[in-house]
Amino acid sequence: MILEAHNLTFYYRNRKKNPIIDRFELMISSGERVGLKGPSGRGKTTLCRLLAGYERPKQGGVLLDGRPIREYRGACPVQMVWQHPETVVDPLLKLKETMAEAGDIEGRLMEKLHIEKEWLDRYPAELSGGELQRFCLARALRPETEILLCDEITAMLDLVTQAQIWEFLLEEARRREMGMLVVSHSEALLEKVCTRIITFD
């Protein structure tokens, strides 16, 4: 499966002359892990949102195997994991309810991500950032997922948790031949986990 961005342009209201993303081109193939680095505020998160279909570009488009990403309904093969997991889960739902919305989660993923069963009966605020991020990863890694967009997903976590998560993701990506976009300020991380690195400047 191939995720492509062609002539991708995006600007916020009344900022047409200063687009945050300007005629950007990108291709990610199955099994490829692309690193993306660049200064804060440059538009890396916005790019991820465009690639996942959460935002509509002002010009250009995003295609998945030649089909516009926004045409996908239901479980999209492109999934995104965010830097701040607490912002993308409903604080009023227990984790088992949030997980149920994503469909069946493989027990193998729960085990590999060290997700404790008792966490399922807790609310998001009762978990640490690392624990909650593990849930978000399990939810994003449904069987249909072919491309995973990782936006600074371990930047706020301790070093041990970072290492555990990336070890798991590398193993999972290789096992499934899953494509990945890895956004990070850490060049050391990108060099370790990615097959190629691009600079967003």
What are these regions (language model features)?
Residues Y123-L127, E131:
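Conserved ABC ATPase signature
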Residues M1-A5, T9-R23:
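A short, flexible loop at the N-terminus of ABC-type nucleotide-binding domains that lies
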Residues K37-P39:
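The feature captures the beta-strand-to-loop junction immediately N-terminal to the Walker
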Residues A52:
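Helix-to-loop junction immediately C-terminal to a conserved catalytic motif
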